[in-house]
Design a protein with these regions (language model features):
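Juxtamembrane intracellular "pre-TM" segments in multi-pass secondary transporters
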Residues: 1-7, 190-221
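C-terminal ends and interior cores of transmembrane alpha-helices
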Residues: 80-100
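Symmetry-related core transmembrane helices of the 12-TM Major Facilitator Superfamily/SLC fold
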Residues: 81-87, 168-187
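Cytoplasmic helix-loop-helix junction between adjacent transmembrane helices
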Residues: 110-146
Length: 262
């Protein structure tokens, strides 16, 4: 039986995961649709996937986060500061016009994805350290629920709201939502970890060892090909629906709500 403290801890991590996913899913969905409506080429829309690059290369600065965290408070500071930047950037995008400030919007979104990726680094590390081995499956389920739930809301429900209230009204609400999702972590005093002892830094030889392990390139190749096909297909589905004459509301229902369940 799960006690109240553990339930609160799991709910706290669910809030963190869904807070990072909803805005990212929304931007990744609505911008290709808006670009196609403005007659951008499919090549340009395909290149838009590069805005997700911070999440792909976040391993480059994850050692920095890990090196400067030893206590629960350290992890919380990384999470709070990252999410605050995330919310500020989302709010800033709301003040801009999509047509007139397109490249500024893209720049701010990329920076916001850096912030959300940094939050994810700290959140994952805290989750690993705060839960025992037998409870890690439960916090992993919170991560999955936050990811799929955030995808459904961000690429589905918010697209429906976007159709009703527009860009400039929706994004400030989204920024506030990100901050509200930090409240459980702020009030949660039950998440405790054993302070880490100073450890030896990874050397070039350690990195080289990882990439020279037996069969490692087969695994990397499989992941690369699997996700390349999946992401490439999804990137073109929504612009294709625009070409077929579907409205933003219909695309949100089909691609976001129904598509997530499938």
């Amino acid at each position: 039986m799960i006690n109240k403290e553990k339930t609160f801890n799991l709910a706290t991590f669910f809030c963190l995961y869904i807070a990072q996913t909803i805005p990212m899913s929304f931007f990744s969905t609505v911008i290709p649709v808006m670009m196609r409506q403005e007659n951008f080429t499919l090549s340009a829309i395909g290149l838009l996937q590069l805005i997700k690059l911070p999440w792909i290369v976040k391993f480059l600065w994850s050692p920095i986060v890990d090196r400067h965290t030893a206590t629960t408070g350290d992890y919380k500071r990384w999470i709070f500061s990252s999410e605050l930047i995330y919310a500020i950037l989302i709010f800033s995008v709301a003040m801009l016009d999509f047509k007139a400030d397109f490249y500024t919007i893209l720049t701010l979104i990329i920076i916001s994805f850096v912030a959300s990726a940094t939050q994810d680094i700290a959140t994952d590390a805290l989750a690993v350290l705060a839960f025992s081995r037998k409870d890690k499956s439960m916090v992993n389920s919170m991560q999955s629920m936050g990811s799929f739930g955030g995808s459904m809301v961000g690429s589905g429900v918010l697209l429906l709201l976007f159709h009703q209230i527009g860009w400039n009204s929706l994004l400030p609400c989204l920024a506030v939502f990100v901050l509200v999702m930090l409240l459980p972590l702020f009030f949660n005093k039950g998440i405790q970890i054993t302070p880490k002892l100073p450890q030896q830094r990874a050397k070039k030889a350690d990195v080289l060892y990882f990439f020279t392990q037996r069969s490692i390139w087969k695994q990397i190749g499989f992941l690369f090909l699997y996700y390349s096909g999946l992401i490439g297909t999804l990137a073109m589905v929504r612009p294709w629906l625009v070409d077929l004459g579907y409205s933003v509301q219909e695309i949100g229902m089909m691609s976001g709500v129904a598509g997530t369940f499938v």
